């Protein structure tokens, strides 16, 4: 059975954010703490990217207004011995979703890993 790399996108809300950098740091730290507490320290966490609709330049998926930030995180994990891409997706969503309760998740990419 093949192995897959599954990338999920999460929308993380940060309250009392002082800046964009602060919101990114807090989001990564809080997500990492929750994943580590669930013994899922093998999940890679990073800030996602978005492209400007006007110029096409990439920028970090972070938005801060009135001290509240929303950060788009990318969560990547390898799923071993999955029966199909759909099976790998279900495994990743269940594991990460359980650790990051009440955080919206969306599948961004599923590729066969080596």
Curated annotation (Swiss-Prot):
Question: Entry's InterPro entries?
Answer: UPF0212
Superkingdom as given in the UniProt entry: Archaea
Q: Which family does it belong to?
A: Belongs to the UPF0212 family.
HAMAP family (UniProt xref): UPF0212
Name of protein:
UPF0212 protein UNCMA_00570
Q: Which organism is it from?
A: Methanocella arvoryzae (strain DSM 22066 / NBRC 105507 / MRE50)
Lineage, broadest ranks: Archaea, Methanobacteriati, Methanobacteriota, Stenosarchaea group, Methanomicrobia
């Amino acid at each position: 059975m093949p192995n897959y790399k599954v990338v999920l996108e999460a929308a993380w809300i940060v309250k009392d954010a002082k800046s964009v950098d602060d919101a990114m740091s807090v989001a990564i730290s809080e997500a990492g703490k929750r994943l580590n507490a669930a013994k899922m320290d093998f999940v890679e966490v990073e800030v996602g990217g978005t492209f400007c609709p006007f110029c096409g330049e990439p920028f970090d998926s972070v938005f801060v207004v009135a001290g509240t930030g929303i950060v788009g995180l990318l969560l990547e994990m390898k799923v071993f011995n999955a029966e199909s891409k759909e099976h790998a997706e279900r495994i990743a969503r269940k594991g990460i979703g359980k650790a990051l309760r009440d955080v919206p998740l969306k599948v961004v990419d599923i590729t066969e890993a080596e």
